[in-house]
Amino acid sequence: MKKPLVGIIGNSYKIDNKYPAQGSGTINIEAIAEVSDALPVIIPSLPNYFTIAELLYSFDGFLFTGGRPNVHPSFYGEKATDAHGFFDIDRDQLVLPLIKACEKVGKPILGLCRGFQEFNVAFGGTLYPEIRDLPGRMNHRMPPEGTLEEQFALRHEVIINKNSIFEQIFGTNKVMVNSLHGQGIKKPGKRVIIDGYANDGTPEALSIKDSIGFCLAVQWHPEWNASSDKVSKPLFQNFGENLRLPSN
């Protein structure tokens, strides 16, 4: 049987700080291939080389990955400051209209970390540049030193709304997640439903009201240990199931 084709949004970087390149973390590819049981294809964040319509026609679903650059605040009506970090305008120009287009036609999409923030901005929401600077909030960034296992370790609890799609997927309304982000949702976008919060009030899971297809995003990185983690695995499995629906 033919497997669904999933476009994994790539990130810009430089090999040896010189040669421009596009890529994605191997764990994103493994999660799609092993848990969603789909064919992963990296889509370069170079919007001049293809149209949104071409992407919609070519792929069965999309994974909006994390990435170090932040969404440029001009896309949510604010000016850039030092606190906003650095940006990848090409990725912004690709993903923001792609998210809206996918949601409109019911194409399955899953957002992770930066992808979570992109979902919110795509629907008119805004972001805080640095969560840890807000009163009463904890530091959601990963430890600056340590192994990958230490940096991606489970860090805090997320309280999931009862009767939400996430509670249905996880089978519980309390989950433990990793945390590797600086920014976070300030104002939810139109139709954005916050389905889960960290104990300090930081939004951690979202869905889109009245969406006709799978349209979910989380602030953490479920791609880490996706084949074994009791939260990550059902999320990617459910994504894979939705990729195979006849309506897709």
Q: Predicted segments — roles?
A:
Residues 1-110, 121, 128, 132-170, ...:
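N-terminal beta1-alpha1 cap of cysteine-dependent amidohydrolase-like domains
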Residues 216-219:
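Active-site-proximal beta-strand elements of phosphoester/diester hydrolases
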Residues 113:
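Conserved G/P- and acidic residue-centered "switch" motifs that form tight phosphate/ATP-binding loops
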Residues 212-214:
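A short, structured beta-strand/loop element
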Residues 116:
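The feature captures the ABC ATPase H-loop/switch
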